[in-house]
């Protein structure tokens, strides 16, 4: 008998392939496994309702196939209060938040973890995230997933070592093609299902239309960094630094046909600033200040240290020096300038495979100060 046979694991079943295979792998490891489908959004239209109903049906079909129970829970109120309202407030303030990080912090590894432990008697929860856990000296570390293309540690940096100690990540040890292969061998309904993109639980939809339901559009001018009016935007909230598509402006006689990129947002004048070329000096930063820090080991940083940072998901590692400003903020200086560092997004720090933690980008240090 496996030592795991007395341990109960609740898997967050999303109706996708990663959580499906996670449940199977845990069964193979000898755990008592059940699923939990979380409903975190009250749908507004038929299309959304259909998508959520399909996900639930797929999760149920997988659980039936694997011979395990599926529980359901509604966290829509928690999601609205702790994720969505903050998400809207950030957009209103001209920043670009990452709702998936908030959702993991408030829902998947808080509300779900508490519900699984208290209501379902779970010893552990499990998710289909591509990350790994390593236990060293009685503390759990968060490691990058084995599949570098799929590593999701960027989204989980807010977790504490205590939360990680109660969590299992079976597919973090595998590469994505292997996960699909296992699902196909088991003839799971999710084997060929497309990976979900879009906002956490809100799903795939036209982002501009969605945001427009909750925040009124505030049109304003699009200006070049040289002060030339080149167009009109429908609202600063629809744009993010480094964005190229959806600006509705072509080349100019002076600038030729190089594409335009968003390089700044002036909230006071409701102006979107653009420049041509993805390495325009105004788009580059030499560092940043991060706030709302979360360190996985929960030890405050007291001295400068070297590491690498990511300022967005799937970005190349950026070598940097991190210096504490106070308990809540750090100063980060890159070895080389970096494009499109975006306030509101997260800066996540690593040493080798270990995810140390991270924070929200409060401000960036531009390569060139505006005249």
UniProtKB/Swiss-Prot annotation:
GO terms for cellular component: cytoplasm. The record marks 129, 345 as: Interaction with tRNA. GO terms for molecular function: ATP binding; tRNA binding; tRNA-uridine 2-sulfurtransferase activity. GO terms for biological process: tRNA wobble position uridine thiolation. Belongs to the MnmA/TRMU family. Interacts with TusE. This is tRNA-specific 2-thiouridylase MnmA. It comes from Yersinia pestis. The gene is mnmA.
